[in-house]
Amino acid sequence: MMATLTTAISPQGPYVGRFAPSPSGALHFGSLVAALGSYLRARSLGGKWLIRIEDIDPPREVKGAADDILRTLEAYGFEWDDTVLYQSARTDAYQAKLDQLLAQDDAYFCQCSRKQIQAMGGIYDGRCHQLATPHQSGAIRLVNRAQVAEFTDNLMGKVVVDHDFATEDFIIKRSDGLYAYQLAVVLDDAHQGISEVVRGCDLIEASCRQLSLYQSLGLTAPQWLHLPLACLTPGFKLSKQNHAQAIDKQHPQASLNAALTFLGQSTVEPTSAAQMLAQAVAQFELTAVPKQREIILTA
C-alpha cells in the first residue's frame, strides 16, 4: 500500500520523480540502482515517476540504446507515467532560454580554450564577459550571479561545494553547438514539474550549479536526493563509458534483489519483476539507504 505524500517533500503539489538515462549504452547495475531508488521513492509517496531520455550528445550515443533502455526497464517491472520525454525534441526550448539569457546579459560567449583555462588555475575567471567588444560565437557561459555553494540533500544532509566551483561562470552551451547538461536538465525538470531529483552522487556537486541556474531563470527548484554510487574501486564508478556489464533482461530477479540490498532495503520474494517492485515499494525505508557517496562492490 502506497504511503501518503508528506507536505515536507513538495508543498506545491503531488510528488513527481524521474529517471533520466542517456542512450550511451545498455543499463548496468549502477543504472538499475538509480532507477530503482527513484522509483521506490516516488511510488512509496504515491507520486508519479517519469522517464526522460537525455539524448543531446550524439557523439556519445549508441544506436538503438534508447529503445533497449526502455525494454530493459519494462523487463524489470518498471511502469512509468506519461509519455517518455526525449531531450532531442526540446532544443527549441533550450535555444529560446539561451537567447533570453544573452539578451539580459545573464550569459555571454566565451572563446577560451581548455589550455587557457588550465593556465587560469583550472577555474574560468570570466574574462570574456569583460571584453569591450563581446564575442559573437563560441561556448556560452552563464553569468553566475547566484553562486550557490550549499544545499540540503534529503539523504546526505548539508552539502557544501568548493568556493571556486560555486562561483565560476559555467558553460550552458558548448563550443561545438551542443546544449550543456546543466541547461537541459534544469529546463526539463522544470518543464516536467519534477518535485525531487533522485540520482547518483556523481552529480551531487552539479546540483549547486543547477540551483544557480534555477535562480537565474526565475524557476522554482526541486528538492534533491543523491544515492550512493556503485563503484569497482574508490572513485571508479560503474558506467557505460567504463564498459560496465549490461544487466540481464531475461532474469531480473537476482539483480533487483542485489539493488535492493545495495540500497539498504530488505530483499523480496523472487516472483515476477512487477510483483517484486510492488513489495519493495510497500516496505521502502529511506532511512535505511546508506548515507555514503560510494559503495564498493564485492564479487
Swiss-Prot record:
Keyword flag Glycosyltransferase: no
Cofactor note: Binds 1 zinc ion per subunit.
First-level EC class: ligase
Highest taxon listed in the record's lineage: Bacteria
GO BP annotation list: glutamyl-tRNA aminoacylation; tRNA modification
GO terms assigned for molecular function: ATP binding; glutamate-tRNA ligase activity; zinc ion binding
Enzyme Commission designation: 6.1.1.-
Binding site for L-glutamate: 18-22, 54, 181, 199
InterPro entries (alphabetical): Glu-Q_tRNA(Asp)_Synthase, Glu/Gln-tRNA-synth, Glu/Gln-tRNA-synth_Ib_cat-dom, GluQ/Sye, Rossmann-like_a/b/a_fold
Short sequence motif 'HIGH' region: positions: 21-31
Entry annotated with the keyword Ubl conjugation: no
A Pfam short name: tRNA-synt_1c
Named cofactor requirement(s): Zn(2+)
Disulfide bonds: none
Segments forming a coiled coil: none
Annotated binding of ATP, by residue: 240
GO terms under cellular component: cytosol
Motif ('KMSKS' region): 237-241
Binding residues annotated for Zn(2+), in chain numbering: 110, 112, 124, 128
Keywords attached to this entry: Aminoacyl-tRNA synthetase, ATP-binding, Ligase, Metal-binding, Nucleotide-binding, Zinc
Protein function: Catalyzes the tRNA-independent activation of glutamate in presence of ATP and the subsequent transfer of glutamate onto a tRNA(Asp). Glutamate is transferred on the 2-amino-5-(4,5-dihydroxy-2-cyclopenten-1-yl) moiety of the queuosine in the wobble position of the QUC anticodon.
Name under which the protein is recorded: Glutamyl-Q tRNA(Asp) synthetase
Natural source organism: Shewanella oneidensis (strain ATCC 700550 / JCM 31522 / CIP 106686 / LMG 19005 / NCIMB 14063 / MR-1)
The encoding gene: gluQ
